[in-house]
């Protein structure tokens, strides 16, 4: 089984990449499962953090039960990696230790069929293209978010990681080019 984790801030093309991967794999002889992580539930920051911890653990357990299914591709749109960004930024939590512990406990650090794809863009580009649903459209906030994503990406114990910049100046790079790069990475590495 392959697990492809798509991460990055808002407006970097995660949903587009997931849709394109789905279309790519539909013609292959594999089962496909897609999980999209949403906002944490809870009234307080502590409840939201506890919710995230429980949900990620449950999904890791579920993933582990499917691990031996050879002809399966699982795609996570957002993941535990994002918790190392948004937990500190918006809930005042410090999830790095438990997030990395999950990766180690469930052998994400030893599995060559787990792929982390980090989509990034310039902070100015993200601020200009913000759709109003992000936490902030200020460049300084985007810079901090990108810095946290970079740190989370580098801290992750996942063996196979790919970072893709999705913009060139003021334009998105063609989604087919990004898809081709990801397909090459997950099928030939």
Give a label for each model feature:
Residues 9:
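P-loop (Walker A) phosphate-binding loop of NTP-binding proteins
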Residues 71-84:
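Conserved P-loop NTPase "ATPase switch" module shared by AAA+ and STAND
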Residues 36-51, 83-95, 135-137:
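Surface-exposed cleft-lining segments at the edges of enzyme active sites
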Residues 12, 16-72:
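Conserved substrate/cofactor phosphate-moiety recognition/catalytic segment
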Residues 69-74, 113-115:
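Loop/turn-to-beta-strand initiation segments
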Residues 86, 90-154:
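A glycine- and Lys/Arg-enriched "phosphate-lid" helix/loop adjacent to the NTP-binding pocket
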Residues 6:
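Hydrophobic anchor at the beta1->P-loop junction of P-loop NTPases
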Residues 132-189:
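NTP-dependent small-molecule kinase module
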